[in-house]
A protein has these predicted regions:
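Extracellular and select intracellular beta-sandwich modules with Ser/Thr-enriched
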Residues: 9-17
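Aromatic (Trp/Tyr/Phe) and Gly/Pro-enriched flexible surface segments
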Residues: 16-134, 138, 149-179
């Protein structure tokens, strides 16, 4: 980098390289456990019931809630990113049970539980200490898009001391990317 003041060069040119940061845990979605439903983590991270604060996997899904309806919305797939060294990816799919549509989902945090049959709680966020400033957040996705299909990706980084609890029955708890 070189400092320019009023478009004039000043000082000596110095080169540096940014530190290589650590990857998010299970960033390639290579680790999955099937314990009544699919979890994107190792078996020892599932906890006693796979939900809430007892679940310590970095990534969470709505599978524990969907499981009550006999469906799975997120599962491992043998379809890795082209050029990667991995063998897996996460397959997110929309399912329907009892007239309720459940979209495939994947988030950092834990599913908290079901209430009112079709509503649930999600604990968004996990402690993660970056050892370098992220240069970029990149991910690979592919999809089979049907009529009316939509996809949304959100990335939110913060300095929180705890998770953010979302109650799908209370819009005031929803994540708003505009704020």
């Amino acid at each position: 980098y070189q400092l320019l003041i009023n478009d004039a060069e000043t000082g000596e040119i110095h080169n540096f390289s940014a530190a290589t940061g650590i990857q998010l845990p299970n960033a390639g979605f290579e680790t999955w456990t099937n314990s009544k439903t699919w979890y994107p983590c190792s078996a020892d991270e599932i906890g006693s019931n796979g939900m809430g604060t007892g679940y310590t996997g970095f990534w969470g899904t709505g599978n524990p809630g969907a499981n009550a309806a006999g469906i799975v919305v997120t599962e491992p797939a043998d379809d890795p990113r082209p050029g990667s060294t991995g063998s897996k990816s996460a397959l997110l799919k929309t399912q329907s049970a009892f007239g309720v549509i459940a979209a495939g989902n994947l988030f950092i945090g834990a599913f908290g539980g079901v209430h009112n049959i079709t509503k649930g709680d999600v604990y968004m966020g996990r402690r993660f200490t970056f050892n370098a400033r992220p240069k970029a957040i990149t991910f690979w996705y592919k999809g089979t898009v049907g009529s009316g299909d939509k996809a949304r990706f959100f990335v939110c980084m913060g300095k929180w001391s705890s998770y953010h609890k979302i109650d799908t029955n209370d819009q005031s708890t929803f994540f708003d990317p505009s704020q």
